[in-house]
Each structure stands twice: as structure tokens, then as C-alpha cells.
Amino acid sequence: MKKIAIVGALLTSFVASSVWADAASDLKSRLDKVSSFHASFTQKVTDGSGNAVQEGQGDLWVKRPNLFNWHMTQPDESILVSDGKTLWFYNPFVEQATATLLKDATSNTPFMLIARNQTSDWQQYNIKQNGDDFVLTPKTSNGNLKQFTINVSNNGTINQFSAVEQDEQRSSYQLKSQQNGAIDASKFTFTPPQGVTVDDQRNK
């Protein structure tokens, strides 16, 4: 009887691992169908009680695996640009820009996960799939991300994604008008405007 219980536990573990592996493979495969795209997005942030904290909108350009431009236009403008080596964050309101090496940037944020779409990143999560919905839970609790959900059509179109932080704050993004195809290289370059304070962390 004890042997049967042990075998049953092993089979359950094997099946669960296979499901997670299949979900991760399907998610990566879907995202791989689109190598570059532009989409507009709306953002809604709520606290742990479901109260609205912020609403915003902007545009997103991605050319996988390492080029992207995340441009928040409302309520306050901010820009996150990767040229493949350097990750720039620019806040026009305070006239400050920060430069970090992309390889040193955290990979446990929803946007980085989507833009990079790397197997090594997905392996850090337990992934469950329900149709076009994928729910990701970090295997370790070291970071601030508690859960990440993304809806991706079979053709690679990202419809929405959301992130829940450890304090239960939820950030939801609805993407629309995704256009696949070539993107002007200028979208993935950034030069700090004159007079902007630059915090260059690339050599620290």
C-alpha cells in the first residue's frame, strides 16, 4: 500500500511537471510567432482592496529578443528604452535619465518577460494554462512579483497582461491595435536631451 502511495505521488509530480513544461513551451511558441510589433495600451493599477490607484495609457514597440520601447504618455510621461545593450529610463517631468546594462536588469518584471521571451526566464515560474490565458507564479519568493497573468492568442497577439505584487497591488494592461512588422530602428535608441541629469550605472 505504501509503495502504491509513493508511486502515485511520483506520477502526480511527473504529470504536474509535464503540464507546466507544456504550458511554458506553448507560451514561448506563441510569442515567438511575432518577432516585432507595435501596440497601444491602457493601464489600471489597484491596491490590495481593489481601489483604483492610477489609470494611464501609452505605446509599446518590441523587437525580440532585446529591443523595446515602452512609452507611457498619461497620466505622467515616462520612457523605457532598450537598444540591446543599455536600458534607459527617462522621466521628462523631473528631467532625469538612468542608464543600466540590459544584462543586469531584472528579468522578473512582466514587461521584461514579454520582451525577452527567453526559456531561462520562463523556467523560473510555475505556469498554468487555460486556453489563451497563462498564469505564472514565481518558484521563489525573493522578488516583488507574486503572480503574472498574460493572455496571448494562438497567432502571437498579446491581448492583456497583469501583475500582482507581494502587497497585492495589481497592475493591469490592455493592449489593442497590435501591428506586426518592421519597426524603425530609431524607436530603439535614446539620447538624453540637453540639460537632463543622467545617472549612468553601467560602470558601477
From Swiss-Prot:
GO biological process: lipoprotein localization to outer membrane; lipoprotein transport
Cited InterPro entries: LolA/LolB/LppX, OM_lipoprot_carrier_LolA-like, OM_lipoprot_carrier_LolA_Pbac
Source superkingdom: Bacteria
Biased composition (Polar residues): 171-181
GO cellular component terms attached to this protein's record: outer membrane-bounded periplasmic space
Keyword Cytoplasm: no
Cited NCBIfam families: lolA
Signal sequence residues: 1-21
Name of the protein this chain belongs to: Outer-membrane lipoprotein carrier protein
Alphabetical keyword list: Chaperone, Periplasm, Protein transport, Signal, Transport
Family from the record: Belongs to the LolA family.
